[in-house]
Amino acid sequence: MKSIKLVNSPITYFISGRDYSEWILFIHAAFVNHNMFKSQFEYFHNKYNILAIDIIGHGQSTDTQKGDGIDKMSEWIFEILKVENIEKVHIVGVSLGAVLAQDFANHYPNSVSSMACFGGYDINNVDIKMQKQNGAKQKVMILKALFSIKWFAKENKKISAYTLQAQDEFFDMNILFPKKSFIFMASLNSMINKYKTGKRNYPLLIGCGSFDIPMELEAVKQWKISEPNCRVAIFENAGHCVNMDVPQEFNETVEDFWTSAE
């Protein structure tokens, strides 16, 4: 994967090549980086063009300026598409990546071929009670991280992945997360309940692991109720980061979603 820095931004992105007609955009979870999708890169690189990014404050996207925040991610992604002459992308987002995928689709629906969100929730219909519960949990996590990133990463891997291999891989990425990068997440709430979901002109796949927290399973259920036309995938023997826990099942599910939607 070739790494490129987007001019006038903190964002580094990665491209596999241009040999195919369709593009996939992978957006990773919080506290890790684009390498959480390494199994997907291996599987899809000879079928699709791959674009992956490091979210602001993560991986190689830490060269920030005053005023930079996560609320600018959609704008930066759109700039990348313009620079690379990419008209449309199949977006795959996991956890925080699922939030950013939806925010991008809210702003630039005509740049979306399809959207697949895992371990996420419908950002256009967030239950305030759920948001408060989520916020309280995030504050506890931040306190742990500020005390010790290693301690935080040890705790975080248990709720982020189910299999031991995926937990270890998550930990190895999480431990590299800089404490100062928490500040860039502060504007995340600006994406919540800002848009009304209209009729999507692209297919939607949502899902999570069967061992994810009950609140996530409920979020997927509620999202399906509000968008009955979407496809749902619940992955057995997987936790939050389903693409890391069960990569083969994940890859096949996503590929089937794209080919059957054509």
Regions picked out by a protein language model, each given a short descriptive name:
Residues 1-25, 46-48, 86-87, 255-262:
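Alpha/beta-hydrolase fold catalytic core
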Residues 230-262:
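Catalytic active-site module of serine/aspartate enzymes centered on a nucleophile-bearing elbow/loop
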Residues 51-92, 252:
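Active-site loop/oxyanion-hole signature of alpha/beta-hydrolase fold enzymes
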